[in-house]
Amino acid sequence: MAFPIINIADLEVGPPDPARAPTGANADNYDIRRVDIAHRIGARKLGYNLTVVAPGKHNCPFHSHRAEEEMFFILEGDGELRYGDTRHPLRAGDVIACPAGGPETAHQIINTGNTEMRYLSLSTMAPIEICEYPDSGKFGVYEDLPDDADGRRVRFRHLARHEDARDYWEGE
């Protein structure tokens, strides 16, 4: 059983996971470094991690969740929150709520400061999720599956655009 307490100061954030490395023309805009906290302390229904973002970068594309709710707590650094059609300055101590919804709740945290930005990310971890990406017109369908034999997370993942839609009866 995992010990239910961990101190953020004791967490080491390593280099980005190569499996999650961004690709494409805008790959240099992203810095994806995070340390899982939830599994280390035995959480089952909430996900949390420590996220670190370099100056001028963001951690993920502008997106919304149809099932999950997220909350972020800014620990260090300055940045900006894109939220729906608005932008808001961020600084240490800010708490951000991102409820489930459509494009009106799409969000992205951008480090606009000169030092690393560190924040705690929390999520309700819905087992089945649909995310929408307004900037690219994509959506993703995700489902958590049982871990593999080595204990690694396995996930169904499919990304598409709405114009890729097929008729329900096509090919049946």
Per-range role (PLM):
Residues 1-45, 132-172:
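A short, N-terminal "cap"/entry segment at the start of jelly-roll beta-barrel domains
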Residues 31-36, 49-65, 100:
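Conserved short histidine dyad/triad with adjacent acidic residue
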Residues 50-55, 65-82, 122-124:
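Short, conserved beta-strand element in jelly-roll/cupin
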Residues 85-101:
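Short acidic-glycine-tyrosine-enriched beta hairpin
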Residues 100-129:
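Ligand-binding loop in jelly-roll beta-barrel domains
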